[in-house]
C-alpha cells in the first residue's frame, strides 16, 4: 500500500524555495534547470547521467535552484548532489539506476557507491511524484557463503534445502549501489517519491544533521532482497521520518553508530511517526554494529505488519542504547524463509560481546558488553509467532525497561520447519523492570513446547502491576508467570486466567527453611493462590 505523496507540483517548488530561503538564499535568482535542455532524451536505453549532472552543476553555478526531471525514463550512474540544489522528479518520470558497476563513483570505498551521492553538502532535496528504480536482480542457489548460524544449523539437522537468495553475480561482483548515499550533509529533505528495488541499502546516511524523510514509498522484495534495507542512519542526528510506507526484504529502518565511513558517532534525536513498515527481517533495528551510542529515539503511531521481527535493540561492540520510547504501535509478526534473521517476535533486546554473537571463543582486546537503559514501550497491540526476549548480559544488565498497556498474542505457525518459541516473553539479566497492564494470550492449537506467558530470570527490582494472562498449558501446571532468581519483586492488581498463576523459583531469600518477605511481595490485589513457591 502506497501512502499518497504529500508534495504536489507547485507545493514542491514552494517547499524547495522555503528550504533555500532558510539557508539565506534569494529565491528571486533561483535557477530552474530542465534536464532535457541539457541533452536528456527521456528514453531508458540512453545514458542520462551527463545531462542530469550538467543540470545540477548549472543550478549550483547560479547559486542554487531546482533540477526538473519531466515525464520519461532515464538511466543514470552516480549523480553528485550540490549544495542548495533540489531535484524534482515529476509524475510520470522514472529514474533507473544503471546496472553497470562502472557507472558509479565511490572513491576508495565501494560501500559509498550510489545513484544519488552527496558529501559535505547543505540545503539539498530530492522530491516529486516520480519513481527511482534500482533494478536489483537476485538469484537462488545453495548457501555456500554464510558460516553456520542457528537457522542454518536447524535446517541442516532437519535435512531441509539450503537454497536461498543472493544478489546476482555475488561475490564476483562487489558493487551494489545504494539509491541515496549522504555523508556529513545538513538540511536535507527527501519526499514524495517511490524508491524501488535498491541493490543495497535504499537510503544510507552518515553523520548527517537535520534530515526530513516525508511521504516516501520504499520497496524491495520481501522474498529475495537481502541487504536491501529501507533507511539506515549511521551517526546521524535531528532526523524525522514521517508518513512513509517502507516494505523491504532487509530491515526497514536502522539506527547505528559505526566507523565504516568515518569515526563512529552517536546517532541521536530521531523521530519516526505515522509510518507503515513490513520486512522479512526487522521493522526497526538498533544495530549490533553500534560502537559508541544510540539515544533519544522516538517511534510512535506506526503500523508494523508482516514483519519477521518488530523491534530489535542489539549491541555487540560495546555501544550503548539509551532513552528510547516506542509507543502507539500495532505489530503483526510472521516468519520468513530460513536465511532471514528472526522468528516472528515483536521485541528483541540483546547485549553480547562480538565473540558471543558469532558463537566464537573470546577474542583478545574485544569490546566489553555495551548497555541498554531507559526504554519505554507503551500502548502496543502485537501478534507474534516467536518469543520476545529481553536479554541483558551477566556483566551488563538491562536497566529501566518498562512495558505499559501492551497486549501480546502468540499463535502457531504449522508451516514452519522449526519453532523455537517457548515463553511469550522472557527477560534475563535486568534491573528496574516495570510491567503495567500487560495482557498475554495464546491462539489454538498450542505448540507442545509453549510454556509461560512471562518468564523473569536474574532480575532485581521487578514491578508487575495489572497483568492478565495464563500459561499455554494450564493442565500441565504451566504457570502464567515464572520467576527465577528474582529479588525485590512486587506483584499487584494481577489475575491469571488459569489455576496456576505465578510460580516462584529461587525468588526469595531463604532463612531457616522459610522464605524472606524482603525479596518478594505479592499484594492483596493478587488473586488467591497466585504465588506458589
How should each PLM-predicted stretch be described?
Residues 11-23:
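Bacterial N-terminal signal peptides
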Residues 21-26, 495:
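Hydrophobic membrane-targeting signal helices
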Residues 29-533:
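Extracellular/periplasmic carbohydrate-active domains that bind, remodel
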Residues 1-8:
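N-terminal secretory signal peptides that target proteins for export/translocation
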